[in-house]
């Protein structure tokens, strides 16, 4: 199952148009019922425009953080964007992604040449790692955060913020481990 965007009815067929409509309705319902705007992962950069008026936070996933188009799009957003460390765990790759999104860029988007101003609110998200044996390796410990702080300082980035994602490899994908 690829998610609601691809298949809005779990038992039905793929229907991305209906998926876009349903995801948008879901975000609107959250706003109406809670008064809070949503956060979402930018899985497909070209689709962000369908939700941009409803989101107050975006994340770029571990498998997309090195993707140039994700970096370009993130550099032009007016909301905070969290760049996850890749599945291998590299802080350096994550910080390079943050540095790229904090800079101005000129790029093609939906057939147009656009220029971004850079996103000063871009920051890191620690989601743990998977080692060569397939074992999960958490990266939220004090020593990890100290190492990340030192690496952040060396890069001289605008926003030295980090979010710890307690899911994924930081909990071994076991929900009951998330609260420790």
Tell me the role of every PLM-derived stretch.
Residues 164:
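Conserved, mostly hydrophobic/aromatic
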């Amino acid at each position: 199952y690829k998610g609601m965007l691809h298949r809005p009815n779990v038992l039905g067929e793929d229907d991305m148009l209906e998926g876009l409509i349903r995801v948008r309705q879901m975000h609107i319902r959250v706003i109406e019922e809670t008064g809070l705007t949503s956060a979402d992962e930018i899985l497909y950069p070209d689709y962000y425009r369908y939700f941009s008026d409803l989101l107050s936070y975006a994340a770029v996933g571990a498998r997309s953080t090195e993707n140039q188009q994700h970096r370009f799009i993130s550099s032009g957003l007016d909301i905070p964007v969290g760049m996850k460390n890749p599945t291998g765990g590299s802080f350096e790759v994550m910080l390079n992604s943050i540095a790229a999104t904090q800079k101005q860029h000129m790029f093609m988007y939906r057939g147009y040449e656009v220029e971004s101003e850079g996103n000063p609110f871009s920051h890191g998200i620690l989601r743990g790692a998977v080692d060569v044996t397939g074992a999960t390796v958490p990266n939220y410990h004090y020593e990890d955060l100290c190492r990340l702080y030192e690496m952040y300082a060396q890069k001289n980035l605008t926003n030295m913020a980090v979010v710890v994602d307690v899911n994924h490899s930081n909990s071994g994908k076991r929900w009951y481990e998330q609260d420790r």
